[in-house]
């Protein structure tokens, strides 16, 4: 149970000064102490990466597991009647050391997975899975928890009541009420899924790195900016110099670099490398056997728990409640989207035929290129024209941080004295308007071979008043870093990603909860993306935009005409962005609405994907899923199984919240304080629909503004 609680972070993420030092920290004979097992002496109790060695993690996990086992044994050996204090609270506190070690280690497995970290992960995961099964199916422990839930729940108040409910239902959903035979099978399923997810997590980054496209001459890169060409050269050097240049593949199906790449054959190679990265085209990189087995085990798990499918089992704890409601929501969007997507594709192809001839057939690897040319012609704008105004440092300090200062009264001070796990990382002390420190924030914005694709937020330490712990939060992105001495310039999409991930960070940093289990982003998947998507809205608010969108050389604000054209371009041909998300969402649901007998073999999985998309009217080579089955890390390696819809679902919530802010004052600190008090600070201490209603006054979300906000 604590295993699940620890790792369901975003993306997935304190002062430890009052956290008790583990009894396992001391080493005999005055030998070096494992820094993961002793209280950090750094400000805020931050993890001391200058002292932590890769060899420290495995013994630290072993000590944390041993300590939690001992604490669980104390709970079940207690002869006194079960109470909130001696059972629920004791369980909440049973894994403090393990939480601390896990939060640091799993930050590295995603953002800086060196061979040493990868090897440690192989050894750690089976230990954690065994512990999770051991605790989840400990009948003596569950009997005590159930007794408190049955006899004390209605007498408890506030967070004590909520914590009791969350812990009890967590055990039930893990299978604590199953028969002994079904419990044993559930343990086997959990263990195998954990092993398979680790395999997927190792194979996919390797497949993505293997899928790079090598380029022999600079001429082949025609259309790219000097900075992009320099990045291709730098990437080639870091990946072995098999050719003078290379194009790395990012985590999504479409590749942004195709926007400017003139060489059609090279565009085709890049696109094909992306979609075939892990489907067995190269026999060493085939995730189909892994994902089909995970899908089958999840389907069996859902049925063991009394549900027809895994989707219904998983969705019960969300705002959506079941697969039927999600499918109805998606169909309402598809109905509006489909004709616009067809018209958009015809429009782009007709434009391309003007220069390429009437027989030219638009291919998926052409779409970004001709759409960009069309946008430049119609709006007279391109990424190369606007990127000089988006220096990553200015976006962070004068945009992301400035918006948080204006709306929530937060201040940020860089702490160069606090060590990090990589030189690219920065650390900031966050304080409120009174000057009181409330959090540490780490940013790690640049891609490297040891980092998986995408962007995410998580925590080195979650907030907890009961543990005397302030939050230590981090954001990770994958922006291409400029050569030494040059400023890193990013695209508008990357600007929005920084605002998005910082929305998650605010959810973690502004948390004010008693219990670790309930704090920060520990909310339903179809609510957790709301604060992040809402925070994106600040990127284009004039007072914020003008503050960070400054020319990297002159410091001049973006000219009004360019700004107007850029903002108009945000929703230029918007069907693609919605379509790729709809397709990925429906693909996720299709896999998790199958019964065990319906799961296709690895050899038929590709055909199943096409059939699933065709069934909902989304089989469209021009608008492929944002992630296809073989590289859908959110679903097979992360916590979004049957939950990828939450990005669209929460976008509806975010539009409603943004509309409320716009109506009452987008940068009004009073409105920001209300949002902080009623939503961001509350964690999972209250039903999320109630939080939404408390802030907006709406009884339920209104989807009418969603398509309008999307430009559709």
Residue ranges, per PLM feature:
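Bacterial Sec-dependent N-terminal signal peptides
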Residues: 1-29
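Intrinsically disordered or highly flexible coil/loop and linker segments, enriched in small
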Residues: 16, 20, 66, 70, ...
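N-terminal helix-rich structural modules
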Residues: 27-232, 661
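C-terminal, non-catalytic "cap/extension" segments appended to globular domains
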Residues: 29-51, 63, 222, 244-246, ...
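Short His/Asp/Glu-rich catalytic/ion-coordination signatures at enzyme active sites or charged loops
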Residues: 41-56, 105-124, 146-188, 248-289, ...
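Short pre-active-site segment immediately N-terminal to the catalytic Zn-binding motif
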Residues: 480-499
